[in-house]
Amino acid sequence: MGCIKVISVFLAAIAAVDARAFFHNRGGSDVIPNSYIVVMKDGVTTEDFDSHISTVAATHNLNKAKRGSETVGHKDSFNINGWRAYNGHFDEATIESILNDDKVNYVEHDRVVKLAALVTQPNAPTWGLGRVSHRAPGNRDFVYDSSAGQGITIYGVDTGIDIRHPEFAGRIRWGTNTVDNDNTDGNGHGTHTAGTFAGTTYGVAKKANIVAVKVLSAGGSGSTAGVIKGIDWCVTDARSRNALGKAALNLSLGGSFSQANNDAVTRAQEAGIFVAVAAGNDNRDARNYSPASAPAVCTAASSTIDDQKSSFSNWGSIVDIYAPGSSILSAAPGGGTRTLSGTSMASPHVCGVGAAMLAQGVSVAQVCNRLKQIGNAVIRNPGTSTTNRLLYNGSGQ
């Protein structure tokens, strides 16, 4: 997700201010009109941040009165392990004023973010669990350490989760909702991914605790700001429950490149949450997608049952690991099941194995490296400059 490209009247002002990291927008139909994410420089104090917000509010109100603008101004503030930012709905004059504040690092357009699943294939076999626990293909038995993620909290940042589904009985709670007022999974995507990372039947980390964080609507879309707000909530919740270092976060979603999105997931990882993300489903280089392009997180591409790159899967040097993503059976809202394909399905396999490793004492900082070290070098035609390592849980099988 690129940052805003201001019209020419702003360029002189931008050049005059401290050469901040102000990124130019690469265009695209996913831009949310007049909606922006403003990221502050490192080291900005609470007092400076609050003063900036007050100044922005006053400027916005003045410009609104002058021009009859219908923009709503500042919306939400974020503080993810010291990374301070906010989003809002501003006119161009207010954005010009924001850019002239030397406490501001950069500004981005807010953009649409979507889930990374593809199609439903009825009655497809479930094969992913057996594949990630064996060096050789074709084994349906899932072999795993008995700790199975016990004591680890996994945040499913998605379309919500059906918290009444028997797959999650006694291990799940609703967290927060940044997209609407409906605390259910009207899409099914979030329930499916949760079933893979921690479901009793279809899951990898079968004893992990689960938190539903809804950032995408029933239609499968949301905003970068809404995703960041959800991540901010996860870090705050984990800190309040003394779960940092014992938590994982799954992001089976994405959009075009966003430095703000990448910064947010990086700070969450640095705070002590293992972050797994989907590479994306456009058969393109994942470095142009966020949060997949954040180097600090574990980016998952999708493989097929015969150890090939899924035709839809993004690729590239930013990909850390392949994981099963084609025709994956998992939970569906209402107590049922469904089969989906996508890098959305690969990411929760990685998240679940990562959570299991955390339960075994591997540190958050080392989980992704460990996965890459022990992964099976079996993926055929993985893509240009892309790893051929397939996720493996270290079962010894």
Curated annotation (Swiss-Prot):
Domain Peptidase S8, residue spans: 126-397
Active site, renumbered: D158, H189, S344
Keyword tags: Glycoprotein, Hydrolase, Protease, Secreted, Serine protease, Signal, Virulence, Zymogen
EC numbers, comma separated: 3.4.21.-
Sequence ranges assigned to domain Inhibitor I9 in this UniProt record: 35-116
Pfam family, one: Inhibitor_I9
Propeptide: 20-116
Localisation: Secreted
Glycosylation sites: N250, N393
Biological process terms in GO annotation: proteolysis
Gene Ontology CC terms, in alphabetical order: extracellular region
Major localization listed first in the record, in broad terms: secreted
Signal peptide: 1-19
GO MF entries: serine-type endopeptidase activity
InterPro entries associated with the record: PCSK9_ProteinaseK-like (IPR034193), Peptidase_S8/S53_dom (IPR000209), Peptidase_S8/S53_dom_sf (IPR036852), Peptidase_S8_Ser-AS (IPR023828), Peptidase_S8_subtilisin-like (IPR050131), Peptidase_S8_subtilisin-rel (IPR015500), S8pro/Inhibitor_I9 (IPR010259), S8pro/Inhibitor_I9_sf (IPR037045)
Summary of the function given for this chain in its UniProt record: Secreted subtilisin-like serine protease with keratinolytic activity that contributes to pathogenicity.
Family label: Belongs to the peptidase S8 family.
The protein's name: Subtilisin-like protease 3
Native species: Trichophyton equinum (Horse ringworm fungus)
